[in-house]
């Protein structure tokens, strides 16, 4: 009886609820992926956590043209989250080629950059993220993701001063849920570039503006180290 009741309820789910359920599933996979790769994500290099908003944006803003790419996008995501970056990249590039990367397809360009980063192709990743920034509309969260990806691509090329500037741009995006992470990445990059004052300011931003961040103690420790070096 219980099983039958559950089946009856499932049949009454609206299209909106089904779409939301797909978003929740994608978010859960994203969270599991982040937990497995947090060492890389926190460092800002090799991998970039694609924002949940981007996944939801794709799922909730479909047009008839985008419906044709929906299945391919879902399959490409599964490949990406399972670590099959080469095949995922080919799928995302095919979607971009056939459907473009504007409107609801904007997250595709971010996934392409992420795949290139994960495959150890920082130059190609830089190109992908710069292209994404040129095409993105006014969505600030997607722009923050592209700036963060560009910072990671530059850092992987050893261009630490440029990387720091891009991380800072991402951190300064209004309502960026990963702002503290971006300030931490910016501070580390500034430090590696030899700009201790900018590094200090970035760490201080975490202390001042994000007192509940998991990076708070790390920021305080780095500030103490900088102060000790400066005598």
Regions picked out by a protein language model, each given a short descriptive name:
Residues 85-86, 122, 160, 196:
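TPR-repeat structural position
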Residues 96-105, 134-143, 171-179, 207-218:
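Short solvent-exposed coil/turn linkers within tandem alpha-helical repeat scaffolds
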Residues 2-44:
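N-terminal positive-inside, membrane-proximal cytosolic segments immediately preceding the first
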